[in-house]
Amino acid sequence: ASDVYKRQGNATNLSKGNLRVNSSGRYLEYSDGTPFLYMGDTAWELISRLNDKETELYLENRREKGFTVIQTVILDELDDMDVSSNGEPKLIDGNIDKPAPGYFTHVDKVISLAAAKGLYIALLPTWGDKVDKQWGKGPEIFTPENAYRYGKWLGERYMNAPNLIWIIGGDRSGDGKNFAIWNALATGIKSVDKNHLMTYHPHGEHSSSFWFHNASWLDFNMCQSGHAQQDFAIYQRLLLPDLKKEPHKPCMDGEPRYENIPINFKKENGRFGDDDIRHTLYQSMFSGACGYTYGCNDIWQMFDTGREPKCDADTPWYQSMDKQGAWDLIHFRRLWEKFDFTQGKNQQTIFGNIPLENKNYPVAFGNKDYLLV
């Protein structure tokens, strides 16, 4: 893409104040009342795997493409607790009550590098495998008690960061023993950090609302439509019900199908492409979502030669940053900046009784002044 498409200047204007939910309970805004668009990229392994120079390269690429938020993790899924990009362990002796100073200085730097570009960091304190191992590396290290202490420590450390959004969870449910741990982690952070929004990242084809809609710490809902479904039915199951829940909370798809990931994780099915990005982006936003997160299979894991590929990753992350799907977001952002989405709503009634095909399901959005289809 030519330079004409690139965003000029910082990703956002952090001087507009902390983020909050607007009065409608549907959208996000700065404390000065200016609407905020959550336009996320998925970089789960950013902190663990990229050094300072690589981090700068990645963040600058995302600023140019109009992203406003980078989703990443402190205690990640793929690498051991004693492995990180700066050679420091993440925890001393694997003890959650002993965060390693060197690693957290690196976390600080990533947040600061992003802030300098006006990018928010949507930060997961841990991936879900440290709470509920299942298919991750683990180990399970959390109890409700130490999760609260870790959360409070994080809240004290980052409460004044100008560019932070908290994400609890990490591809896991809130059921069973998990519920008390996630709740304690969130409550620990919020016990000291009153400045930042918080949501929850669930496992595939689920929403944070399934367990935490009424939790005082959950400011907005996040669903994961996941990497198997290919039509609008998944939003009819997840996003549309969330929009109807009381009390109203903003909602969004925080993990739709990734560009270049095998469909349903099977190579013989082919891979999701840029058209899938546009489908999920416009279908969710025109339904009334407050934001959207893009993902690329090679970037979430920061795949490179010499690293074990997950989900059949096949291209180094730095060669994957300019895929068409990533460029598509800046066009939506310009549309969003032209029309006041906070004053619009879904307008499906314009289709009348026309039979609608589910895979290419048309969605309309607007108000008396504009209509987008």
Name each region found by the language model.
Residues 1-5:
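Short, small-residue-biased leader/transition segments that mark boundaries at the very start
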Residues 6-30:
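Low-complexity, Pro/Ser/Thr- and charge-rich linker/hinge segments at domain boundaries
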Residues 24-220, 224-232:
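Active-site mouth of glycoside hydrolases
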Residues 34, 250, 259-261, 273-373:
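Aromatic- and carboxylate-lined catalytic core of secreted/periplasmic carbohydrate-active enzymes
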Residues 67, 119, 249, 289-290:
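Short glycine/serine/threonine/alanine-rich loop segments
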Residues 117, 192, 246-247, 287:
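Helix C-cap/helix->beta junction micro-motif
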Residues 172, 218-220, 239-275:
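Active-site clefts of carbohydrate-active enzymes
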Residues 182-183, 235-236, 271-277:
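Charged helix-capping and loop-helix junction motifs
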